[in-house]
């Protein structure tokens, strides 16, 4: 990108903005490359895909989906009220299928292995204490679709809501 911009400038065409990047490459931007801006899309939140790529650690993921257990049909299965409309169906960038589940469960042993539009199916140990009404957190595989539809973000610190942030651009893709 920088070489192409240099060649373009060399033939007399001015370039004021040189913009490139992605979340996995953001850490390599040192400010001296010639880029005037970078565009790391999920950098502000990170997600399960960035953890799988090694871009971030799980403790760097700043957004999770709060979902409620709505059914416990068998000892080794639970149903939550977050499905593909909330979590998305991504399992990796550009069909890479890096991830086998549809999100990362926080503080719960098990996997989120299937989604319908409105529900997620958890496979859990038969002796799991999860019960109907329990709230759990799921880090989405790809945070973009999850955050695009949200009307509010709840800022938590140590499990306590510290701030409610209204999202003015919720669903604003046209």
Spans of features found by a protein language model:
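C-terminal accessory subdomain/extension
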Residues: 74-174
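Sparse, context-dependent recognition of short Cys/His-centered cofactor- or disulfide-binding micro-motifs
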Residues: 3, 23, 50-54, 63, ...
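Short coil-to-beta-strand transition motifs
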Residues: 59-66
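A residue-level signal for beta-strand positions that form part of recognition/binding surfaces
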Residues: 35-37, 66, 77, 119
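Active-site loop/helix belt of alpha/beta enzymes
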Residues: 1-57
């Amino acid at each position: 990108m920088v070489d192409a911009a240099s060649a373009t400038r060399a033939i007399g065409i001015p370039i004021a903005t040189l913009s490139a990047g992605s979340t996995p490459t953001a850490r390599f931007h040192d400010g001296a490359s010639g880029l005037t801006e970078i565009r790391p899309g999920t950098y502000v939140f990170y997600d399960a895909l960035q953890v799988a790529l090694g871009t971030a650690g799980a403790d760097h993921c700043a957004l999770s989906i709060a979902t409620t257990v709505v059914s416990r049909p068998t000892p080794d299965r639970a149903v939550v009220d977050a499905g593909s409309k909330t979590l998305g169906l991504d399992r990796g960038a550009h069909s890479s299928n890096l991830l086998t589940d549809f999100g990362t469960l926080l503080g719960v042993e098990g996997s989120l292995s299937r989604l319908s539009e409105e529900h997620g199916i958890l496979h859990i140990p038969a002796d799991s204490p999860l019960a109907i009404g329990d709230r759990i957190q799921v880090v989405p595989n790809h945070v973009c679709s999850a955050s695009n539809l949200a009307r509010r973000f709840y800022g938590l610190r140590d499990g306590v809501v510290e701030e409610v942030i209204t999202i003015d651009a919720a669903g604003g893709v046209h």
